[in-house]
């Protein structure tokens, strides 16, 4: 489907029988209408040609070879002077053979058949619409019991018995005895309704607007006051909400409920269910062909029974209708009703649902997962030194992705006379190649995608940089948007080629522009997993307490009893530092550990200090100054009790974390001031 903006899209939904017929029907020049598949045959065993009106019929689906009919006649495709467009003998149209990839056929079912997706899948749409238990509807569809229905509001033979099951076994045998075969057929059509035709009649009688109004009025009813009754009311209201949403969807999309019961069964184009000849002359066929054959066989049998209904017992007709329903169920979803159908080698047939669902299905493997040019794939690893909008590309991947641009750069700078010379320089890994590659990558973003792409943040743009190794380096903060982690996940990298694609990547898709979740608006670039553990280790410190650190001999490994003459650090149980640079320098020289408690001179508000907290210890100096030691800070006072210095008790990890936060806030303010 192509919308008004020329965007190609695919939509799956219910269609009317008229639409199915329009997809498959063709009118020949002689007035004959083709499109219905009536025979369960594929290819003739002698001529190896498709059987007429079979599953591979050239009249219905188009010629196998372009411009050549079944008789062997040839016409030039697209030549307006060539007449006629159809072969007069075999009625095959002279068109391109690619028509067999999209030209459909149909099977006219002898009885209505419910679509098993809408009956058996949970929630059951048919059960929701009819407001009846699923088990009850299944028994009705598969002819296990029947409805007694009044005609034109007149009393029936069954006295409005309603839904009845053959619990009284005499009902099965008394009705045929009271009526002749012909009379039983008339009686059943007038008095009894069973099979999918009953479901279709009830769905056709539904008024979606009435369902909305009645469900809404029932939903507005208040509680009864009884606890058990209120629980039933809540469950009923949940069901009514689902029913109203379903009715709104059908109204909005112009879908009729009776379309969930099939009268015409679409037949896939033959190229989507091929028969391939392998070594030894053997044929390998798609499982769907065998399932289609089973449907046609049973449908033709039912058609024959109905044409000779005057001599056919009604029970036999009902049994055959059940077989047709089961055959269509197996075609659409094998095994949904229990034991799946198997071939002679005890292998389960792949139904239509098996073909399209899952990772190896038609959608994810063929439509969504197609291989494209200018793309690569590799395992992701953490790159903590990268900026948020950058990613690290291995040299091997980068030179392949940007090889065309590198060749153009070599030729423009007169470093290579032609493409062959440029490729040889690339193969030899000359230094100039990597310089040109870095220039190319500096102005060219790349797209990273992690399957499955479930929302917008599943694919984001990054500025690439060259890294060693064979893995893609990624900033850990962008992993949540991709739902990725570093336990072996793989990502695909794509190169946007057109100027429009590059502009879209830069303006809309860069990772530092997608910091909020598009669904709920919460921040999505938040620390998770390894980062949380790292922040915990960085800021945990030694939590045994100030007294334990001072008097526990096992905790003194971080600060030995010796003077550091080169920095003139005065040792007092825990080291003192005038600024954070000295503390980090001592850590880099391995004089203290990351979680070593230390005293850092700090500018602290005096109002915070002027509290009623009593000091743990007070150390007096010979000159009259003294130190008041509290739990998390230390005050140096003069003889006049004036505050000279204030130290806070911290660790190198806390200092590093604080500096990173401070730099980030300052960068944010600079960016805001630059933007205004």
From Swiss-Prot:
Residues bound to Zn(2+): 69, 71, 87, 90
Cofactor list: Mg(2+); Zn(2+)
Family affiliation: Belongs to the RNA polymerase beta' chain family. RpoC1 subfamily.
InterPro entries reported in the protein's UniProt record: DNA-dir_RpoC_beta_prime, RNA_pol_asu, RNA_pol_N, RNA_pol_Rpb1_1, RNA_pol_Rpb1_3_sf, RNA_pol_Rpb1_clamp_domain, RNApol_RpoC1
The EC number(s) this enzyme carries: 2.7.7.6
Subunit structure: In plastids the minimal PEP RNA polymerase catalytic core is composed of four subunits: alpha, beta, beta', and beta''. When a (nuclear-encoded) sigma factor is associated with the core the holoenzyme is formed, which can initiate transcription.
Residues of the signal peptide: none
Catalysed transformations (reactions): RNA(n) + a ribonucleoside 5'-triphosphate = RNA(n+1) + diphosphate
EC top class, as a word: transferase
HAMAP family: RNApol_bact_RpoC1
Keyword terms of this UniProt record: Chloroplast, DNA-directed RNA polymerase, Magnesium, Metal-binding, Nucleotidyltransferase, Plastid, Transcription, Transferase, Zinc
One GO cellular component term noted in the UniProt record for this chain: mitochondrion
GO molecular function, one term: zinc ion binding
Residues annotated as binding Mg(2+): 485, 487, 489
GO biological process: DNA-templated transcription
SUPFAM superfamilies per UniProt: beta and beta-prime subunits of DNA dependent RNA-polymerase
Name this polypeptide is given: DNA-directed RNA polymerase subunit beta'
UniProt function note: DNA-dependent RNA polymerase catalyzes the transcription of DNA into RNA using the four ribonucleoside triphosphates as substrates.
Annotated cofactor note: Binds 1 Mg(2+) ion per subunit. Binds 1 Zn(2+) ion per subunit.
Subcellular location(s) of the protein: Plastid, Chloroplast
Primary location recorded for the protein, binned into one broad class: plastid
